[in-house]
Amino acid sequence: MSRRTRCEDLDELHYQDVDSDLLEQRDNRCKVKWTHEEDEQLRALVRQFGQQDWKFLASHFPNRTDQQCQYRWLRVLNPDLVKGPWTKEEDQKVIELVKKYGTKQWTLIAKHLKGRLGKQCRERWHNHLNPEVKKSCWTEEEDRIICEAHKVLGNRWAEIAKMLPGRTDNAVKNHWNSTIKRKVDTGGFPAESRDCKPVYLLLELEDKEQHQGVQPVDGQGSLVSSWPLVPSIVKEESSEEEIAIAATSAKELGHEPVPADLGEVRTPEPPESLKREYQEFSSPETSLPYKWVVEAANLLIPAVGSSLSEALDLIESDPDAWCDLSKFDLPEEPSTEGSVVSSPVQPQTSQQQQEEALQSSQQAATPGPSVTEYRLDGHTISDLSRSSRGELIPISPSTEFGGSGIGTPPSVLKRQKKRRVALSPVTENSASLSFLDSCNSLTPKSTPVKTLPFSPSQFLNFWNKQDTLELESPSLTSTPVCSQKVVVTTPLHRDKTPLHQKYPSSEVLPDQKYSMDNTPHTPTPFKNALEKYGPLKPLPQTPHLEEDLKEVLRSEAGMELIIEDDMRPEKQKRKPGLRRSPIKKVRKSLALDIMDEDGKLMSSTMPKPLSLPTSVTPSSCGFTSPGSKEGNSLLNQGFLQAKPEKVVAAQKTRSHIPTPAPMTHAWKTVACGGTKDQLFMQEKARQLLSRLKSSHTSRTLILS
């Protein structure tokens, strides 16, 4: 929770009626907040008529009294009021005046401080200037005390602050709203450790409340109880499962089991001092207010004067024995109406337990009157210990013992060992029959289950390869069709044979197979493509990257060009130092590929000479005739057959290109930098370069 700024507090105070604690004329007052128009009207009236006659000023307001107008002016609207931060001189003045007048005369102290009110001086002293106020960090013990006290007292910060010496009510409230409340709401508040002592609150009760009974402090369900004058007699009984186990073991050994009766438990009485205090408290002659102790479990215990420390020492000496409910039992005799009234009980000692166990065994050996036993679930006690309210314990009488000493146990205790159903990997019919027979042989549950119209095993079957392929490549239909095959079979147990027994040593396990395989694993869509087009053939890595890219580009262009690499082998040879890298060759070949095609087309359209030298053959020049050898590829022949069409198309396009018009003198002047401004800029550039040339070395631009 973020703290509010000073301006927000002043704005709220500006429009708030803060004179609600005045005692006079309470019926005729208007408790509505002052509006902005009323404040402006009051300022104007005070400037005009002064502060002498407040009744006359209040007559201008329909529902405001003279005291309200005066209070509003003096506490809120007075321009002489100082509402800013305190200075060191003001703090020192307040400390001196408190030493002189005490901490009660705040109105008198405020008269010595110009522009300050008594309320401001009081809050400044109690929150900041008081030397007893702690300004250190909050400890975990203080947080725990605030949390426990807030459960009982609520937002009564003044009373909570009395439990924390050195902390003010305002500091406690701010710490709760900013830190502890968030931790409690989110469950992040640390749980109470065993070493922490319980919190005790001292509350004073008036005399009139003594005869009416003590009420809960904060209405939060705190349990109010008086000190038990007579300790109740309780009995302990073992749980149901222990009874059944003891009965079965006794039958096997041939002995009759002894009923679980631990006898009566005598609890220690409270101290005599507490008895006297309780009797004095209950007597009608007492008129003084008494102090009550509120323990961490929200129990109110009467205590007076010096005996309070004795009661606290008694509880603190053995908190486990006083607060552990696991050692407590129930009353032995039920009421006639069938209801059981719970009463406070006290723990027992180990020596008493041994003596009473001895007595119970003797009583069990001798026949005696029938005793009604009570059965109690252990979870009930644990739930009751967590509860903060007074509740009755639900108890139901157990079955009576017969003449033989033991009766039939209840149906809940007739438990059989669960039979394990082992299904062998056989046919579906036999497996389903054996599974149904084994299910019928089991002990029926309390709630019958209706047979299902379908087999649950259809959700557990694994898909085969055909189903996977159909889901990956479904058929394109207007209506989606489910291609999964419904197989109604009984699920069998998974084969849990170890891998070293299931697979021989000669075979390779799946994980070893994948670890030894160096080839990357192909995803399923690529596997489908490989099945369609055939497996990939590994090809050796070729160093002729340029030729491979040429083949790809020519195949995409839909034509085949004649490679003339064999024509000039000497020109292609270069010196070892000037050899280009394959990347530069590829870059250049990609850029000059189109120029290569145009040059070949132009060379094919040139007319053949009448006589060719004998050393030059058509095959060496790169041309092929239609009647050449069959060794030429079909693509080369197709290229030669399609030559006349391309030539005609090229001639048509060139014939339609118009001749460019000659440039005029004005165009040349503008385009070639002959205007005045261009010449001026050129001259300036030359001058700049001439200046820089003497001081800087020229660098040539290398374009490669």
UniProtKB/Swiss-Prot annotation:
There is a cross-link at residues 104, 197, 275, 414, 450, 485, 502, 513, 527, 537, 550, 588, 600, 629, 643, 652 (Glycyl lysine isopeptide (Lys-Gly) (interchain with G-Cter in SUMO2)). Residues 339-366, 607-620 have a biased composition (Low complexity). It is found in: Nucleus. Residues 54-77, 106-129, 157-180 bind DNA. The modification Phosphothreonine is found at residues 267, 443, 447, 490, 497, 524. It comes from Mus musculus. Phosphorylated by cyclin A/CDK2 during S-phase. Phosphorylation at Thr-524 is probably involved in transcriptional activity. One of its GO terms (cellular component) is nucleus. GO terms for molecular function: DNA-binding transcription activator activity, RNA polymerase II-specific; RNA polymerase II cis-regulatory region sequence-specific DNA binding. Its main location: nucleus. InterPro entries: C-myb_C, Homeodomain-like_sf, Myb_dom, MYB_TF, SANT/Myb. PANTHER family: MYB PROTEIN-RELATED, MYB-LIKE DNA-BINDING PROTEIN BAS1. Gene3D superfamilies: Homeodomain-like (1.10.10.60). Keywords: DNA-binding, Isopeptide bond, Nucleus, Phosphoprotein, Repeat, Transcription, Transcription regulation, Ubl conjugation. It comes from the Eukaryota. GO terms for biological process: cellular response to leukemia inhibitory factor; mitotic spindle assembly. The gene is Mybl2. CDD domains: SANT. PROSITE patterns: HTH_MYB. Transcription factor involved in the regulation of cell survival, proliferation, and differentiation. Transactivates the expression of the CLU gene. SMART domains: SANT. This is Myb-related protein B.
